[in-house]
Amino acid sequence: MAIELEKKWVLKEIPDLTNHNFEFIKAEKIVQSYLSKDERLRIISKPGAKIKEYFHQIKNKIGEGQSIEESKTITEKEYLKLHKSAYKELTKVRRTYLNVADGFTYEIDHLRFVSPRVDILLMEIEFQDKYQDLLEVDTYFELPEFFDKYILADVTSYPEFSNYQLAQPIK
């Protein structure tokens, strides 16, 4: 069980990180199915890989930008059994980068919706190892300046931008 402290932004486009001291870590497709507001299932697959990873996760919000997340690896059979109770789902492609200058991991999620046809780009940075709360993050952390041209809004405190709220009902 880990305490998660993160900030989230909506982006206009995927940032060009070349020449900005970022190291590409991985790309993966994530399907999140919700059993309740705090309980979800995840399938994670990497491009070109046939193996999928299955997780059962519980995430409880404890403050603005803070939550406690418990994650357990499960089998495909366990996933399929639990998935029968899922009622919302979200699919995203995540690209993860390490900013060598500040040591933080930047996750850029591309969410693509069919009806209505909308694409949303979200960027998250997790801070739990360095800062205690969002006030401290806002006081001491500076997002690299070149991100200014890519950011539409800081949506950390907007529940409408939680993955749960963005998920669509399963048909």
Task: Please give the residue ranges for each predicted region.
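Phosphate-end processing signature that detects enzymes handling 5′-triphosphorylated RNA
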Residues: M1-K171
